[in-house]
Amino acid sequence: MGLYGQACPSVTSLRMTSELESSLTSMDWLPQLTMRAAIQKSDATQNAHGTGISKKNALLDPNTTLDQEEVQQHKDGKPPYSYASLITFAINSSPKKKMTLSEIYQWICDNFPYYREAGSGWKNSIRHNLSLNKCFLKVPRSKDDPGKGSYWAIDTNPKEDVLPTRPKKRARSVERASTPYSIDSDSLGMECIISGSASPTLAINTVTNKVTLYNTDQDGSDSPRSSLNNSLSDQSLASVNLNSVGSVHSYTPVTSHPESVSQSLTPQQQPQYNLPERDKQLLFSEYNFEDLSASFRSLYKSVFEQSLSQQGLMNIPSESSQQSHTSCTYQHSPSSTVSTHPHSNQSSLSNSHGSGLNTTGSNSVAQVSLSHPQMHTQPSPHPPHRPHGLPQHPQRSPHPAPHPQQHSQLQSPHPQHPSPHQHIQHHPNHQHQTLTHQAPPPPQQVSCNSGVSNDWYATLDMLKESCRIASSVNWSDVDLSQFQGLMESMRQADLKNWSLDQVQFADLCSSLNQFFTQTGLIHSQSNVQQNVCHGAMHPTKPSQHIGTGNLYIDSRQNLPPSVMPPPGYPHIPQALSTPGTTMAGHHRAMNQQHMMPSQAFQMRRSLPPDDIQDDFDWDSIV
């Protein structure tokens, strides 16, 4: 018996311990602990144990009231009810089943004298229970019921307890972890920065065709070391200046180099922007510059309609061309260049053809695009500071055939600097092809390459070249009497709003080719290459290469160190002594050019180390 009596308590304790552990570790009962389940459980408890114990759970029964017998039992001591139960008793005792906070306080003090002397801490507990307990509902006063404070009532249908759920982790996508230099970065966004300047600069993003307004009221001393510190290959942008003269479009492409970049149309306008290298790989089909067409049409109306109205189609006044609605400037002024006239195009031109560029026989500098001709010209009222570069470079489009396009040979009073001609760009889809802008090497490192890289037509350098060549045109020296067919075809194109089909455009390209052949602008490829290499090795050699067609090399000679621009850029020769000598040398150079064979003019173009030359004959796909 002794052993049995000792074993029974141990067995009982083990059973109780196992039940306790199972109840503590098992959480199956937790979801079932809702308000309704608690109310039903309280009803069962009330039926089993009587009314005394159920009053302690009065909170769980919204209809519970307090009997006077119980009031008398707990009159002397602290009542065995929770604050929620006291609130329930108070509200249910009201005929309207609602009470204000002060009325609840008063009811508790009247029925339980303990709380009269218990201080004010219990009142805070009453307020907390009213606010936090789901069983109590706040009822606002009606307008016809004067008084202070809202009513409190018992919610007979409390909301079920919602089981807390673990928040799901947000899946990380690989696409979100993009680098700051990805194609989706904000560098293509081109935020619109509008300042109080009277003439902002409209910059066209060549990738997204977004338009950005930049403040053009910048200090003229800004250096590309701070604003344009990337390489030349990273610079390609056409900035459209909206001037106040009608619908004036001034295209000012900006490039960077070791010297300062300044003045466009006015000294206050300096659009500068960088485009990453990846933008250059996009095809020209993504460009859509509608303003270029409007610019060309305005130029045509201002210059060529006036010339057509004259009998001889010649002697266009310089004033009329200066008042042209199209003002296209492409300027670069090294810090040491002779630059005294801010409105003239006297700066040495920073373009990809600085040290000589290579274009294949049918692909010369101005890539002719199809349907929106753009003609850029701004006459230079200061001839000694007219920009000088390579001879005119015609660019035939992939559709060669028989019709002139307006690329006039512009006469210049200087013997070594034939004025650049105009470049008309057309594209069938109203989009404009452009040239890649690459940093030219120093003149001592010029090599005779004969190819064009695959990104030659990928960026805005064609626009830059056309702006550069047409920027210093002196229209008073132009003789268009021998190119009446060209003028007529241009007039017909203008009548058709420049909506040319392929055949008409091919005619224009063919006439353009004939025009440059007759004017001597298309020179021998071998001679040009030979002179580019030879002249680059001897930049100070006397001007005996004028007749060879390599006028760019000849223009670099006999310059003092103070006037030397950075390597790879055309130099501004000093003003020659007399106009007579100038004109004589100029005519001699022109006559020698006319005697050159009409072969494709080759220019050298500096290529990056990883660039691949494009030797494909684009005329073969026509």
Swiss-Prot record:
Q: Which residues cross the membrane?
A: none
- Renumbered to this chain, the Polar residues biased-composition regions fall at 249-273, 316-331, 358-379
Query: Which spans does this entry mark as compositional bias, Low complexity?
Result: 332-357, 404-422
Q: What Gene Ontology terms for biological process does this UniProt record contain?
A: cell differentiation; male meiosis I; positive regulation of transcription by RNA polymerase II; regulation of transcription by RNA polymerase II; spermatogenesis
Segments carrying the region annotation (Disordered) are 145-178, 249-274, 316-450
InterPro entries, alphabetized: Fork_head_dom (IPR001766), FOXJ2/3-like (IPR045912), TF_fork_head_CS_1 (IPR018122), TF_fork_head_CS_2 (IPR030456), WH-like_DNA-bd_sf (IPR036388), WH_DNA-bd_sf (IPR036390)
Molecular function GO labels: DNA-binding transcription activator activity, RNA polymerase II-specific; DNA-binding transcription factor activity, RNA polymerase II-specific; RNA polymerase II cis-regulatory region sequence-specific DNA binding; sequence-specific DNA binding; sequence-specific double-stranded DNA binding
Query: What are the entry keywords?
Result: Differentiation, DNA-binding, Meiosis, Nucleus, Phosphoprotein, Spermatogenesis, Transcription, Transcription regulation
Q: Name one GO cellular component term.
A: nucleus
According to the UniProt record, list the residues that bear Phosphoserine: 223, 295, 489, 606
Where along the sequence lies the DNA-binding region? 77-168
> Among its keywords, does the record have Transcription regulation?
yes
**Localization per record:** Nucleus
Q: What does this protein do?
A: Transcriptional activator of MEF2C involved in the regulation of adult muscle fiber type identity and skeletal muscle regeneration. Plays an important role in spermatogenesis. Required for the survival of spermatogonia and participates in spermatocyte meiosis.
Q: Give the protein name, as stated in the record.
A: Forkhead box protein J3
Task: Identify the species of origin.
Answer: Homo sapiens (Human)
